From Swiss-Prot:
NCBIfam families: PRK13677.1. InterPro entries: UPF0325 (IPR020911). It comes from the Bacteria. Belongs to the UPF0325 family. This is UPF0325 protein NT01EI_0832.
């Protein structure tokens, strides 16, 4: 699992927090950020440079004939797919944690209201 990330030397992909991708001249620059340890001000990161793949294609405009384009490297595409899977899983886990905490807070409120209602009923019975 995560063979492409491991081929980059990333031995613990589960420690990845996020990534950024930008284009500089004829290269794509991938920067991977890892989770911060307690007491650290900055997250550790690694940077990779991928040359853009050049292709010559037939132009839509008949007068130009052929034209050259550049696109993302296939290897980088595979790495990004793995990063997206990792980051999406982390976001889903965070969303689930948030939902569970929200449900727990709601349950606390419902139970507190029910206890107050029962105590009020009990007070009515003992007050007579």
């Amino acid at each position: 699992m995560y063979d492409n990330l491991k081929s980059l030397g990333i031995t613990q992909p589960e420690e990845i927090d996020r990534y950024s991708l930008r284009q500089e001249a004829n290269n794509d620059i991938l920067k991977i950020y890892f989770r911060k340890d307690k007491g650290e001000f900055f997250a550790k990161s690694v940077k990779f440079k991928y040359p853009r793949q050049r292709k010559t294609i037939l132009s839509d405009n008949d007068s130009q004939g052929m034209r050259e384009i550049s696109e993302i490297s296939p290897n980088l595409r595979y790495v990004i797919e793995e990063l997206d899977r990792l980051c999406l899983r982390d976001r889903q886990e965070e969303d689930l944690k948030r939902k569970i905490l929200d449900d727990l807070r709601h349950l606390e409120s419902v139970v507190a209201n029910k206890i107050a209602e029962i105590e009020a009923d009990l007070e009515k019975l003992t007050g007579k």
